[in-house]
């Protein structure tokens, strides 16, 4: 029988703090908080006031939030709430600092996870999603999270969908003007598409494709105008290579495909297909998305991940001429090494490149047989090669170690500098959605180009030689390998002046960087290229062939021209249909085609509308938005989800998120604290920043960034157990036995040997512990206390239910210090604490305040335990000492603290009580720095009282290095109070 089970026996005093009493206390205070609106945040204007009927009254705003959850059918396990508890502790702390705290929770309810769960259960997604939300909301409420529940919403709510579609409409109706000044003062800004039309109408901007034919904007048909505008819109339709996943029956964004070329969800193969889809022109914001990272308080690892994903590089755009039967065609390439143009001996295009529509009907004379791939003519060869390429995943195509494949197209490109005639190949390692889908091949300076040249017998020209003092020599490479280096001396790179090519150019003798600058200037003067910036980032594929997502506010006329629906028509709701399952295919069927479930609902698709020129027949777009759409802007809707006139009202936005709205936010503004997993670094976080910047440019919001501070919580891990067959067995039924010869514990299940492994917590691993189990057996406060004490918030930590009882014992001891277990009344003394107590109390206040500011609740808890242990040793517990202790513990274990506060005679909730302030007369005296060593290496330092009890010092030391011990009990702990704790970890 566990200690906790013993504590619930009938012979216990009536007011012993145990699981049953904890539940009574927690239910009582949660009801009070709900009825009084204790955690209501006060808006500046309108009806959203705080629980006492006041408005903000000049209080400083503080906005703390979590990455909102998918409403999974499985509900929560104890690993999920770590971030929620952390943000709740921070929110409660800031309220006690006198700040007006906005802390709310919504639900990310559209998308693939919800749809797949509905398909599995045979119920409509709305039914399952709403049931899941209700269950998850119950679990979170029972945890005692201090949300303003008036601000709760789900992304599937029609009122929310309306504004998601409204934002899409603003993005669709915008273009990126490189010359405009954005609100931050730098160049480049989203502007209304009407301004672009005005530039075309006035002649200020040339009409693409009509620079020389004299046509005016008004001369073009509506369809022609829309085609041109589509090439500028920030949300646009294009036929381009996409990631097609037959196993899921939908296309995926690059960010949703793993490095192995599989779907992030389901792990299905992903193939490259050319399809007509919606995209968002996020690449226009590439530079700003990188540059503005410097102004926000994010973990460096996340900033680095975004910088690498965006992948800004400086190089040149170069135009080659390709001769075809239909005349000369332009082939644009992007290269980071324009200095190597003299070493280009062939060119390669993606199998999807538009130039391959112009291949000749016959092979040119004298083409080597191995260039033809065994095909009778270029048309057959290119078609077959393209089909083969589409059957490969993107990862397979760019695999450096894989066999280099390719074939000649029958076309030749002309080097714009040398005039050399270069054979044009197609190869699947060139991707259409990276760069321009065409590359100049320099086998003397690139390993992949070199391997390709060797395979097809193409010439190799070296244009860079090692530096004279490098100790290296080009002879070491010639005929053997490429010389790959950005630092060297340029050779074999000069051309005489000609009428066709322009001025003479010589790069010989220059260092590489100097050669790049010189050749870029020559390219621009010759009109065949220019220095430019490119990005690894691709435009965001924004449409999905799913049912459970936001419909696009777009309809098409009989001629296929898209039309944006007016705001008055929003929201466009999903039809309530019985057949919502996506059509999936054999995961390896690369030739399959997407089929949007909405296309099967003809009554919804075909509509009669009057869009200003009379009633006509239109057809709705049958794609839906990705699940990222709703999560791109949800943080703003917390400000006022009841507002039917604005996405967010400007005054309220500025109060909660505007630049310098408090001492934390800085010039960029944004949410003060955003807690969530690092796995969203290049998905949700990047997309949200993009949408926010568009809205910022257009004047709808006043902060340049959505989230000022980001904090990535760690992961709660757990042990799982298997039998000798390798099958997982219920972790809660496994019995730990004596250690074996190596000192490791043994385990049995139903009397049979069991094997232990460490990793994630999951239903399939049979090691889930639910919050409901914790509430029933320990209470929410003990659960909160345990999660916050397990180790640093930003590091992963192992769950061990056996260790939870330690937190319960601490709360029991504190309860006994305040409450008589027999009468249930407070029994503290009004006497002034002695000087030793005052010193420990005020040092604890100072130290715990610092820990709370630094989001280190684990070490704060350790210090509170030390203070409580001291109070336990006194003959009578002074009110003046225990009340500050209760206030400091309240953000972590709020229910029991509210109950003790009430029993001490306070009529109001302690949630708005001022945070304790240390009396400086007692701070800093009689303390010493204790060193915590593991295997002789210093791993932590603690400021502790000189007369600290060795047992208390041991507890603080173990808490400080809990993450380094991996959840295991140390083999030995040697305490030399007050200065040294030496730990020998378990092997």
From Swiss-Prot:
It is an enzyme of class 6 (ligase). GO terms for biological process: leucyl-tRNA aminoacylation. It is found in: Cytoplasm. SUPFAM superfamilies: Anticodon-binding domain of a subclass of class I aminoacyl-tRNA synthetases, Nucleotidylyl transferase, ValRS/IleRS/LeuRS editing domain. InterPro entries: aa-tRNA-synth_I_CS (IPR001412), Leu-tRNA-ligase (IPR002302), Leu_tRNA-synth_edit (IPR025709), M/V/L/I-tRNA-synth_anticd-bd (IPR013155), Methionyl/Leucyl_tRNA_Synth (IPR015413), Rossmann-like_a/b/a_fold (IPR014729), tRNAsynth_Ia_anticodon-bd (IPR009080), Val/Leu/Ile-tRNA-synth_edit (IPR009008). Its main location: cytoplasm. ATP binds at residue 763. GO terms for cellular component: cytosol. GO terms for molecular function: aminoacyl-tRNA deacylase activity; ATP binding; leucine-tRNA ligase activity. It catalyses: tRNA(Leu) + L-leucine + ATP = L-leucyl-tRNA(Leu) + AMP + diphosphate. It comes from the Bacteria. Keywords: Aminoacyl-tRNA synthetase, ATP-binding, Cytoplasm, Ligase, Nucleotide-binding, Protein biosynthesis. A motif ('KMSKS' region) lies at residues 760-764. A motif ('HIGH' region) lies at residues 69-80. Its EC number is 6.1.1.4. It holds the Pfam family tRNA-synt_1g. Belongs to the class-I aminoacyl-tRNA synthetase family. NCBIfam families: leuS_bact. This is Leucine--tRNA ligase. It comes from Bifidobacterium longum (strain DJO10A).
